[in-house]
UniProtKB/Swiss-Prot annotation:
It holds the Pfam family FTHFS. The keyword Ligase applies. PROSITE patterns: FTHFS_1, FTHFS_2. This is Formate--tetrahydrofolate ligase. SUPFAM superfamilies: P-loop containing nucleoside triphosphate hydrolases. It comes from Sinorhizobium fredii (strain NBRC 101917 / NGR234). Keywords: ATP-binding, Ligase, Nucleotide-binding, One-carbon metabolism. Belongs to the formate--tetrahydrofolate ligase family.
């Protein structure tokens, strides 16, 4: 049996083209590519603005079933499908998110795909890349510093220090920083107060960068951030302490999309990186809309399962950016479906048709949920060597009962050649005119009813549990003019419920709301459910333990 190469070995052996050549394929002149080395570049804001009058290509969303430790390969399928479409002669750009350092050194892994369906340079993308996350972290923490400084020098805006809503962020998993006391050590250090850190991908600044149309829209949204409240409970905005201009300066370059390439030298935008369990889980609007102006097809992903990423892609990103997806692909694996059917991880390599059929309920619900938005669906079965013909056929037969089609894909092992069939079917579906996209709920629906709609229609919950404080807060925001905003649910990615251990397709459960936060700059209301954390912790054995530099100075153990 031939040796199976690791992702990093495959990526390191890639024959990359100079990034200027990748840009030339899209008609981007060299003077509008801002290079970071030879294999990555930012696309200038001037070039992007000049493409506004171009027509749009077809937009394809890649989503998945609920993630399991067995792995689904959503990013791998996104990249593979992009290569597959280019292989059959369709000019295609892949749009994915940047990786966060926290999960890279924690448990989740990287964001560059896998096997022979990756974007490169993989090591750079998974580590510091072009510095976007540093810029976002800096802009966020500048605002935090300015808030404390404003209070220290007299508090002209009369901010109630008990009601400051802005925490600090860092791009790392660190549970020790979730709740802290700041400004200790005496009068010279300010007013002691309780605060804390979130991970950078949960920052409202990250969401703003990913939803802003251009730099002016970015600055306006930054100014709209609510940093806290006065004693009369009126909001204080970032613009009130004159923070928005300096924050925009820090984000000027980060606002421009990053161009890289796949292993097969096809263009990919990697830009922005909000998580889908604690944020809206989509790459930047600027990257997606620019790609639509430059290509016939754009393949993008939304984080975690369709209950989180796809719902937010449709209800937040598409609603705010005026996007209309033409088709969706739900990624599933035999192994993950069996795990949703009750099989333990160590037994996933054994054929188990009974558990597979039981676990298909999870896949079926995701397919039906996507269809609720009026978007036609295909299922991609991401192939593993342990899959049996009977198991693959059982999934195909089940998906057929849903009125959709499942296609076996071998892109991890074979690259674009292994996903040609799906590429052809995506083209046919996207061009058939079946998409009748519509968000799940209207803008004018009351905020709590929007939450109930998501919980009941997408999660199949029977009720939403919220105390009087939460309901009153939602009504206050409606009175202040924020009732039109969409909802961003913060929920475990492992289940349709708020219990991460409840696999399959549970129904009739309750969704408890722990907290609500107004992201006025980003333009949505965050609803925190269950035990979800906006600052993750590291696992008992973090991935960092395997990462090192070898004798030749190359990185080992990254993936």
């Amino acid at each position: 049996m031939p040796e199976v190469k690791s992702d990093i070995e495959i990526a390191r052996a890639a024959r990359k083209q100079p990034i200027m050549e990748i840009g030339a394929k899209l008609g981007i002149p060299p003077e509008h590519l801002l290079p970071y080395g030879h294999d990555k570049a930012k696309v200038s804001a001037e070039f992007i603005a000049a493409q506004k009058t171009n027509g749009n290509g077809r937009l394809i969303l890649v989503t998945a079933i609920n993630p399991t430790p067995a792995g689904e390969g959503k990013t791998t399928t996104t990249v593979g499908l992009g290569d597959g479409l280019n292989r059959i002669g369709k000019k295609t750009i892949v749009c994915i998110r940047e990786a966060s350092l926290g999960p890279c050194f924690g448990i989740k892994g990287g964001a560059a795909g896998g096997g022979y369906a990756q974007v490169v340079p993989m090591e750079d993308i998974n580590l510091h890349f072009t510095g976007d996350f540093h810029a976002i972290t800096s802009a966020h923490n500048l605002l935090a510093a300015l808030i404390d400084n404003h209070i220290y020098w007299g508090n002209e805006q009369a901010i109630d220090i008990r009601r400051i809503a802005w925490r600090r962020v860092m791009d790392m998993n660190d549970r020790a920083l979730r709740q802290i006391i700041g400004s200790l050590g005496g009068v010279a250090n300010g007013y002691p107060r309780e605060t804390g850190f979130d991970i950078t991908v949960a920052s409202e600044v990250m969401a703003i960068l990913c939803l802003a149309a251009d730099i002016r829209d970015l600055e306006k949204r930054l100014g709209n951030i609510i940093i806290g409240y006065r004693r009369d409970k009126s909001p204080v905005y970032a613009r009130d302490i004159k923070a928005d201009g300096a924050m925009a300066v820090l984000l000027k370059d980060a606002m421009q999309p990053n161009l890289v390439q796949t292993l097969e030298n096809n263009p990919a935008f990697v830009h922005g990186g909000p998580f889908a369990n604690i944020a809206h889980g989509c790459n930047s609007v600027v990257a997606t809309t620019t790609a639509l102006k430059l290509a016939d097809y754009v393949v993008t992903e939304a984080g975690f399962g369709a209950d989180l990423g796809a719902e937010k892609f449709f209800d937040i990103k598409c609603r705010k950016a005026g996007l209309k997806p033409d088709a969706a692909v739900v990624v599933a694996t035999v192994r993950a479906i069996k795990m949703n059917g009750g099989v333990k991880k160590d037994d996933l390599g054994k054929e188990n048709l009974e558990a597979l059929r039981k676990g298909c309920a999870n896949l079926g619900r995701h397919v039906q949920n996507v269809k609720k938005f009026g978007v036609p669906v295909l299922v991609a079965i991401n192939h593993f060597t342990s899959d049996t013909e009977a198991e693959i056929q059982a999934i195909k037969d089940y998906v057929r009962t849903l009125g959709s089609e499942a296609v076996l894909c071998r892109h991890w092992a074979e690259g674009s050649a292994g996903i040609e069939e799906l590429a052809h079917k995506v083209v046919d579906l996207a061009n058939a005119g079946h998409s009748q996209f519509s968000p799940l709920y209207p803008d004018d629906m009351p905020l709590f009813h929007k939450i109930e709609t998501i919980a009941k229609d997408i999660y199949h919950a029977s009720e939403v549990i919220a105390d009087k404080l939460v309901r009153d807060q939602l009504r206050t925001w409606e009175d202040q003019g924020y009732g039109h905003l969409p909802i961003c649910m913060a929920k475990t990615q492992y289940s349709f419920s708020t219990d991460p251990n409840l696999r399959g397709a549970p129904s009739g459960h309750a969704v408890p709301i722990r907290e609500v936060r107004l992201a006025a700059g980003a333009g949505f209301v965050v609803v925190i459910t269950g035990e979800i954390m906006t600052m993750p912790g590291l696992p008992k054995v973090p991935s960092s333990e395997k990462i090192r530099l070898n004798e030749a100075g190359y990185i080992e153990g990254l993936f």
